[in-house]
């Protein structure tokens, strides 16, 4: 796992989707098996074993069995929403075409959907890459999403993101409507987790338009 890399198109980093923590881990584990410089074939199956999952995410092997089974059981229904505000288009597609849990072998096999493959074939695209181990100890799917959104801008060390866009990306438009709740339950726990468990140190602040909070500003760097 030490050298396993997650590489995604920036469009995928900023897409709207909601996965559980372990569904997210399952997808990321499969992505590390790709070589983004080579075409991904639709029929390719990717294998994630309970032993590998246990080692990567530091969970007991028996827990890894049930975790993989549960995460794989819902993965086929999970979708992604893409936004192109300039072209005024929206897309929606599944993560996977197929997913199987092999009870006797304690493993999952999955194949990515035809529609997501262009976001994983990284030739001629802007993309974000990071080591899987950096997010392996994050405790929520939201923390993983924040890490990806920040590391996408690691060269500048700054990122502004509107609350509207953040809610769209995290698919929480109708949740945590008060900023106090958004900060308490999503932002603060995610950033604190990133600061304690990854290679980033992050500070953040609000941006206002008059009295209204409209955006968030993040300043970050790789920890020394």
What are the functions of these language-model segments?
Residues 1-224:
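Charged, alpha-helix-forming regions
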């Amino acid at each position: 796992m030490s050298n396993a890399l997650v590489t995604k198109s920036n469009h995928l980093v900023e897409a709207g989707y909601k996965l559980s923590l372990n569904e997210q881990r399952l997808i990321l584990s499969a992505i590390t098996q790709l070589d983004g410089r080579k075409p991904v074939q639709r029929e390719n199956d990717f294998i994630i074993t309970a032993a590998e999952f246990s080692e990567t995410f530091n969970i007991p092997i028996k827990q890894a069995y049930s975790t993989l089974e549960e995460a794989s059981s819902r993965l086929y229904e999970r979708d992604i929403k893409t936004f192109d505000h300039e072209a005024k288009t929206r897309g929606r597609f599944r993560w996977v075409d197929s997913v199987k849990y092999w009870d006797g072998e304690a493993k999952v096999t999955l194949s990515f959907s035809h529609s997501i493959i262009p976001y994983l074939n990284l030739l001629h695209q802007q993309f974000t890459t990071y080591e899987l181990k950096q997010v392996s100890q994050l405790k929520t799917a939201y923390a993983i999403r924040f890490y990806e959104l920040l590391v996408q801008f690691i060269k500048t060390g700054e990122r502004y993101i509107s609350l509207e866009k953040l809610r769209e990306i995290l698919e929480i438009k109708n949740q945590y409507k008060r900023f106090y709740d958004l900060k308490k339950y999503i932002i603060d726990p995610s950033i604190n987790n990133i600061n304690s468990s990854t290679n980033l140190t992050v500070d953040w602040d609000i941006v206002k338009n008059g009295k209204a909070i409209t955006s968030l500003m993040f300043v970050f760097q790789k920890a020394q």
